[in-house]
């Protein structure tokens, strides 16, 4: 009986581990960037840009503590940004591209492998989603008008999913797929930039100068 109980427990443990592993595999794979840019920190003498790039299955909320700790490693008064790719990455395509890189690039640097792998996964052919980002730098009172114009320009039978995010310099408007933007951009090209497989600034620290 004890043996049967142990066997049952072992089966349960194996199954739990299997479920955990499967859950991790099913989580969206995203590319992130922590960066303190030169142009954001011109007020600091002899400033040198810092950056940290990697792939992750964690959400922006789960990574906030990591970003805060990374920011604290910088200089006093340093302005730091946390970016996350709007589109999840295709794991299998990224693996294929990495294998090609390892085969054909004799100078592949193992020291910077993590950043290199993230760079490979960031290629547009490795995108698992097709979201677009509009970088909206107009005044906030124009935002609703812009979103309504997006809806009017999209002629598909299935409505777009639209997200709005505050950024350090304005707003980011993310749509769930592409559409014909010619009419939209003819009206808004002075204050809006379309960026397709782009990174979203999800958090920042310090005061921008």
Which residues make up each language-model segment?
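Positively charged, helix-rich recognition surfaces that bind polyanionic ligands
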Residues: 1-8
């Amino acid at each position: 009986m004890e043996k049967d109980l142990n066997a049952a427990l072992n089966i349960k443990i194996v199954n739990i581990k299997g479920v955990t592993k499967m859950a991790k595999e099913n989580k969206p794979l995203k590319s992130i960037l922590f960066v303190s840019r030169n142009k954001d920190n011109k007020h600091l003498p002899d400033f040198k840009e810092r950056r940290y790039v990697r792939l992750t299955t964690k959400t922006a909320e789960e990574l906030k503590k990591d970003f805060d700790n990374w920011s604290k490693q910088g200089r006093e008064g340093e302005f730091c940004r946390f970016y996350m790719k709007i589109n999840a990455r295709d794991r299998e395509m990224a693996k294929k591209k990495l294998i090609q890189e390892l085969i054909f690039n004799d100078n592949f640097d193992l020291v910077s492998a993590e950043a290199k792998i993230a760079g490979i996964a960031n290629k547009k052919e490795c995108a698992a989603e097709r979201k677009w980002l509009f970088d909206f730098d107009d005044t906030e009172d124009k935002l609703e008008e812009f979103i309504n114009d997006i809806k009017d320009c999209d002629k598909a039978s299935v409505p777009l999913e639209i997200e709005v995010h505050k950024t350090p310099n304005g707003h980011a408007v993310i749509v769930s797929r592409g559409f014909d933007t010619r009419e939209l951009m003819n009206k808004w090209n002075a204050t809006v930039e379309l960026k397709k497989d782009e990174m979203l600034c999800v958090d920042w620290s310090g005061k921008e100068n």
